[in-house]
Amino acid sequence: MRVPVKPMPNAPSPENPMGREAERAEAGRQGFDAVLDNLEFFLTRLRGLSCCRSVDLPGGGFCLFTGSDSASENWVFRRGAAPDEEAVHAALRFFEACAAGEGAAPFIWPLPEGGGVLPRFGLPERGRLLAMSRGCGGPADTADGGNPEVSFVPVLDEAGAERWAETMWQGFGAGPGAPGNLHVLVRGMRADGTLTLVTARIEDQDAGTFLLASAPSSPAAGVYYFAVPPRYRRRGVATAMMAEILRIVRRGGKRQVLLQATPSGVPFYLAAGFGALGEIPLFSAGDDVF
């Protein structure tokens, strides 16, 4: 991953631009680590759902299978050094056991720059997410950026979870009819009690989704499943959703919003005030990593 350079020991001062650069680099490194902390928290919550399967890896980290046939929904999460062959063999055995047919269930393995041994095992780099963050506590963040046409409804029951799953599925470019395993996963996330699922609505029609994940002790909240179906993308729904996210996060006493953006989403998030922290390479046998 592209982690900012290690800070120099120089103290920052107006006469010391290297010190100021070191300070910015350290802030960027801490922000990048916060994104990974939040992602680990979110995936750990999914590990606890009865509909998911998981296993610890030798040397640290874990595998997570959500029941999906999409690589982007199944994860290996392991921080630190590039993986060794023992960890890769363990991950492949796990996802082979999860597969409904021949071969292994698809999955993504993020983080190690260059992939270490992963490409030798048929897991080349397939794309990159951009870790991003923005604050939500200053005066400029209190302005109403919402759209009066858009309302927001928290997902509080299974019926709401079913609609949320369908809207999110279409928001990521698929046609009607989300797969059954996705409905099961969303029902589990709704029942978790720690994750916050919200539906955006226009004229009583579901128009967008997002999920917020935040550890109780963390000053930050992470955004997941931020999705707007194509028919609502020119009606200001995404902008209204981001304004609602900032309001929810502030009300929860948090100071920062974190996310991992796909390439297509980066321009919107930059316009919404997010800053880039570093790239997260994704390694997979499949190409559906976003």
Where are these regions (language model features)?
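A short, well-structured alpha-helix characteristic of acyl/acetyltransferase catalytic modules
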Residues: 157-170
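A conserved beta-strand-loop-helix scaffold within acyl/acetyltransferase catalytic domains
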Residues: 176-229
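Conserved acetyl-CoA binding element of GNAT-fold acetyltransferases
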Residues: 71-81, 219-230
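Conserved beta-hairpin
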Residues: 54-59, 111-116, 120-124, 194-210
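Acyl-donor-binding surface of acyltransferase catalytic domains
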Residues: 80-156, 261, 281-285
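Conserved active-site alpha-helix within GNAT-family acetyltransferase domains
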Residues: 114-125, 235, 239, 251, ...
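N-terminal charged segments
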Residues: 2-101
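Conserved acetyl-CoA-binding loop-helix of GNAT-fold acetyltransferases
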Residues: 84-93, 225-230, 234-247, 251, ...
